[in-house]
């Protein structure tokens, strides 16, 4: 781990910005925003009332990071690691983001998917300290006063969930708060968005999870989920309260709402507020980026693909709609593009006239039934003969060996995306995909899988189609540009910006996404491209327009190095403060 540490350390008072504070003594150590642990300098200890409250040694952030990594190595349980890492955030915010940024590839699966799903399911059992804002259905009429209780005055990014569809785990109620918290950690770690500008929110309207309603450690309302007009009124009141306090251009990201509400709220609020839904639009952008990367490998334009989805919920529909936009950009009409996309859900293939209900959002991808109607997903593959299958059902190993072999027999280079989270819900493993297609497939997954070595010695590095490639960079650009509304074209631009960062060498390794180790650079580059797009298309409202967009973005990213807490000390000219000599 020493190789990951920043070997050049400079005295904090010289290298760091000065942070003006009013607190002194113990409160500085109890506030994670100002606490440095053993890294307070001697001058800070003496002038800020800390001398004697800490052991005499003065540490660098490097040593603190090294201590963290050595302690982490002693732990074996992912949940134990999660509790330890998030405990660092509660005590020392700068150190938390320093260690996360230094080893993002290894630590992201702990602070976010897949471990965050386990942490959410155990939220009441591992609870240490509340994070974020909790608003319940019982608070109707008083939401603004609750928002006013949040101590930060300059929030620019809100991630909100109602806990109904947490990853592939279903309705977790307020236990879902771990998702907004984890998401905003990645806003900061990947894109440098200031943590004090971020607000995680959980809307509690009850839960239909019977196990939680019987759990003595559950922390939400002990009632069935409210699905009446009162629920809609609460969301309306929340949106108004946030923007009344923090401004109309405050970014509000909807996260893990149920399918019906996710689409409904996106359509309802997108022209009124600065909002997006990561499950719909973020997932769509990262999936499209993977397809655009596959296009580079097989030299087959996206407009010539036939795509079959396993799942027809918000993720599938979001991906499908963005693929349609890309196909239209490549010369097809909207109707021609929609006809190239099929969906298979738990009731079977989406076809006209089927008994199972079809949502209005699914209608563009509901086609006339083929001559032989498939009973299983494998049948659908053999009948429709798709070039690409995309799994977003969250139902486990439904890309069976027979499905994968069928794709390999139909296509020279089959595209197989198993995007469901967490790992246990993935449609197949990377090893299954590469082995059963003899290394010919182009594979991406929603959860991390390690490199796969085939019997002939070839090694493939599967790409992880994680939304983290998209949402931090998009959020940074939107915030810096004072954007008022976020169109789907922004996510199309982000997908293209992501694909453009892949090297030929990485494509040859089987990667459809850049290495996660490069996520900070990737996110900043996406933010730059999206910023350029927003200004070029009159969607940016921060003036004057910066001439150098790259410089503008890079100069406004938050850093994890410690700030100096000392007041500015400087000299005045002696003559300016000396009284004149009075002569009689």
UniProtKB/Swiss-Prot annotation:
Coiled coil: none annotated. Signal peptide: none annotated. Its cofactor is Mg(2+); Mn(2+). The keyword Acetylation applies. It comes from the Eukaryota. Subject to allosteric activation by fumarate. GO terms for cellular component: intracellular membrane-bounded organelle; mitochondrial matrix; mitochondrion. InterPro entries: Aminoacid_DH-like_N_sf, Malic_enzyme_CS, Malic_N_dom, Malic_N_dom_sf, Malic_NAD-bd, Malic_OxRdtase, NAD(P)-bd_dom_sf. (S)-malate binds at residues 165, 421, 466. Its EC number is 1.1.1.38. NAD(+) binds at residues 165, 259, 312, 314-315. Divalent metal cations. Prefers magnesium or manganese. The keyword Cytoplasm does not apply. It is found in: Mitochondrion matrix. GO terms for molecular function: electron transfer activity; malate dehydrogenase (decarboxylating) (NAD+) activity; malate dehydrogenase (decarboxylating) (NADP+) activity; malic enzyme activity; metal ion binding; NAD binding; oxaloacetate decarboxylase activity. The modification N6-acetyllysine is found at residues 156, 224, 240, 272, 346. A divalent metal cation binds at residues 255-256, 279. It catalyses: (S)-malate + NAD(+) = pyruvate + CO2 + NADH; oxaloacetate + H(+) = pyruvate + CO2. Keywords: Acetylation, Allosteric enzyme, Metal-binding, Mitochondrion, NAD, Oxidoreductase, Transit peptide. Fumarate binds at residues 67, 91. Residues 1-18 form a transit peptide. One of its GO terms (biological process) is pyruvate metabolic process. This isoenzyme can also use NADP(+) but is more effective with NAD(+). Belongs to the malic enzymes family. NAD-dependent mitochondrial malic enzyme that catalyzes the oxidative decarboxylation of malate to pyruvate. This is NAD-dependent malic enzyme, mitochondrial. It comes from Homo sapiens (Human). The gene is ME2.
